Curated annotation (Swiss-Prot):
Residues 1-30, 74-93 are cytoplasmic. The gene is DAD1. This is Dolichyl-diphosphooligosaccharide--protein glycosyltransferase subunit DAD1. Keywords: Apoptosis, Endoplasmic reticulum, Membrane, Transmembrane, Transmembrane helix. It comes from Hordeum vulgare. Belongs to the DAD/OST2 family. It is a multi-pass membrane protein.
Length: 114
């Protein structure tokens, strides 16, 4: 086996080992982020195959997915116990921030639809 392949295998093993120690609530947020990004990619593939006639709808869908993923990543950063920057922030406050920002994002998206 080439050295680069061995290094890649060691890297993947160390990442899997580190991720196994991640708390369940952070893994759920990660799953939500992956779902939002995959949904955005599916919309882009659909637009490439079928077309983008109602372009506002396409943009709204993709921006909603990407915006939601970004907000979820920010929420993950805030609720991570290992992050010293947000140690004084209560998890309930972080979730309230996430919900409020999501509401504003989706109101803007709905306004963009017309």
């Amino acid at each position: 086996m080439p050295k680069a392949a061995g290094d890649a295998k060691l890297l993947i093993q160390s990442l899997n080992k580190a991720y196994a120690a991640t708390p369940t609530n952070l893994k759920i947020i990660d799953l939500y982020v992956v779902f939002a990004v995959v949904t955005a990619l599916l919309q882009v593939v659909y637009m490439g195959i079928v077309g983008s006639f109602p372009f506002n709808s396409f943009l709204s869908g993709v921006l909603s997915c990407i915006g939601t993923a970004v907000l979820a990543v920010c929420h993950r950063i805030q609720v991570n116990k290992d992050n010293k920057e947000f140690k004084d922030l209560a998890p309930e406050r972080a979730f309230a921030d996430f919900v409020l920002c999501s509401l504003v994002l989706h109101l803007v998206i709905m306004n963009f639809l017309g």
